[in-house]
UniProtKB/Swiss-Prot annotation:
Its main location: membrane. It is a single-pass membrane protein. Keywords: Membrane, Transmembrane, Transmembrane helix. The chain crosses the membrane at residues 107-127. It comes from Homo sapiens. This is Protein FAM162B. InterPro entries: DUF1075.
């Protein structure tokens, strides 16, 4: 998070840089704020939500960093092995957890598609070898089909001429 307060520039993770006009550039490290207890909603400013109306100048908007997972998200969380059952999934989870689970699901789906593609390639190879044993080819099929069409066209022309 990047926030300017007076002549200080807070870069997040406790790093503060003094950047006022004429001030020497120095970086100080402040201890990072403690994480809230598990189960309570997190907020981007680190504090609890305030219901005092409009916020003043220089304050950060407090946005909840946890959200309710949809049924699809729950299925992805189960499929990727993050949780063992639907009952274990909490009502609110961090979006990073959902993103990580979606990425893992995407990779698993790609691996499945790669495997199916390899299986399909082997199936085509086997069927092509069997067709060669029967002396079948696309060229012979096309020639036979066109010969049949010519015969049908000739019969239709004879029937029309009568």
């Amino acid at each position: 998070m990047l926030r300017a307060v007076g002549s200080l520039l807070r870069l997040g993770r406790g790093l503060t840089v003094r950047c006022g006009p004429g001030a020497p550039l120095e970086a100080t490290r402040r201890p990072a704020p403690a994480l809230p207890p598990r189960g309570l909603p997190c907020y981007s400013s680190g504090g609890a939500p305030s219901n005092s109306g409009p916020q003043g100048h220089g304050e950060i908007h407090r946005v909840p960093t946890q959200r309710r997972p949809s049924q699809f998200d729950k299925k992805i969380l189960l499929w990727t092995g993050r949780f063992k059952s639907m009952e274990e999934i909490p009502p609110r989870i961090p979006p990073e957890m959902i993103d990580t689970a979606r990425n893992k699901a995407r990779v698993k789906a790609c691996y499945i598609m790669i495997g199916l593609t390899i299986i399909a390639c082997f199936a085509v190879i086997v069927s092509a070898k069997r067709a060669v044993e029967r002396h079948e080819s696309l060229t012979s099929w096309n020639l036979a089909k066109k010969a049949k069409w010519r015969e049908e066209a000739a019969l239709a022309a004879q029937a029309k001429a009568k």
